[in-house]
Amino acid sequence: TSVCSYLAQMLSMVALPFFLQRTFGYNDVSTGLLLTAWPAVIMVAAPVAGVLVGRIHAGALGGTGLAAMAAGLAALAWLPDAPATWDIVWRLALGGVGFALFQSPNNSILIASAPPERSGSASGMLATARLTGQTVGAAAMALLFHVVPDNAPRTALLAAGAAALAGSAVSFMRLSLPLPDALVRRKNA
């Protein structure tokens, strides 16, 4: 699920500047300011998701988050011809909130699943999954510019949404698995 989420995020973050500038005519500064909506909502939503993981199963939070991210990315891909600033911002915010709802619970469940003496290895797995997703996402964007040069950014956003949706499905599958003891204690506290 981490690979899917980070692939989706990197693919979309590489595609969006091209999309906003080439398709809608935004300049560099406006594009940069618009894109801050994604990390800004992550800063607010990630700590909330961290608290919620003590109350709601991490699989449900992660699955819901990645589904929201997929919806935000699909909505970005199908922006109207002359979008208002708000049209772009709410879609970016939806993607960012979705990513935050996934990231904190996913990290919590992975670290809590490892025995204490293996927490360093679990953390390393998270980093490896993150970098794998980011690398594949960036490479996929380069490939799309080669294969569909006229429509690469929109295609990338749709592909990113599909990756997030795949991650969502896998995350929801965790609902059938027992929670790690550390999360059960936290939930019952």
Go through the PLM ranges and name each one.
Residues 183-189:
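Short, highly charged, low-complexity non-transmembrane loops/tails of multi-pass membrane proteins
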